[in-house]
Amino acid sequence: MLAMKLFTCFLQVLAGLAVHSQGALSAGNNSTEMEVVPFNEVWGRSYCRPMEKLVYIADEHPNEVSHIFSPSCVLLSRCSGCCGDEGLHCVALKTANITMQILKIPPNRDPHSYVEMTFSQDVLCECRPILETTKAERRKTKGKRKQSKTPQTEEPHL
């Protein structure tokens, strides 16, 4: 199910890029000369920053999975990009909420209504060090700490 959603979003992005590139080709001159994108522009486009990304509504609002939404995904700004060092990754420093009007369709498909849904967008991004431990490893460590804090009764020495 998730793979199908991702594939659908991928196709939508691909279609958008195809339309954009066709317009760019027809707007340019008919010469066979290729334009070279300068390094500074390449770096600026690929460096850690908020970028638009299609996100599934059901992933952002998991308590609403019993309904169908149209559109099923929305365009949100998310931190993405390269940091120039393998020890760093792109993370959000500041977020902001955005409210969008979405068509909400119940399972029986009637009556559907327009609803306002709030989503979180990344506004400011920064390259930060990657933490070595994963969330699962931190949970295991926390569980062990809790166990060791519980008082243990000792048997009296006779």
UniProtKB/Swiss-Prot annotation:
Coiled-coil segments on the chain, per record: none
BP GO terms, sorted: animal organ regeneration; branching involved in ureteric bud morphogenesis; cell differentiation; cellular response to hormone stimulus; female pregnancy; gene expression; glycogen metabolic process; induction of positive chemotaxis
Top-level taxonomic group: Eukaryota
Annotated stretches, region: Disordered: 136-158
A GO MF term: protein-containing complex binding
Keyword Disulfide bond in annotation: yes
Record-linked Pfam families: PDGF
Signal peptide as annotated in the record: 1-23
Alphabetized InterPro entries for the sequence: Cystine-knot_cytokine, PD_growth_factor_CS, PDGF/VEGF_dom, PDGF/VEGF_growth_factor
Positions bearing carbohydrate: N29, N30, N97
Bias kind Basic residues: ranges: 137-148
Keyword Disulfide bond attached: yes
Family: Belongs to the PDGF/VEGF growth factor family.
Function (record text): Growth factor active in angiogenesis and endothelial cell growth, stimulating their proliferation and migration. It binds to the receptor FLT1/VEGFR-1. Also promotes cell tumor growth.
Subunit structure of this chain's protein: Antiparallel homodimer; disulfide-linked. Also found as heterodimer with VEGFA/VEGF.
Protein's name in the database: Placenta growth factor
Organism: Rattus norvegicus (Rat)
Lineage: Eukaryota, Metazoa, Chordata, Craniata, Vertebrata
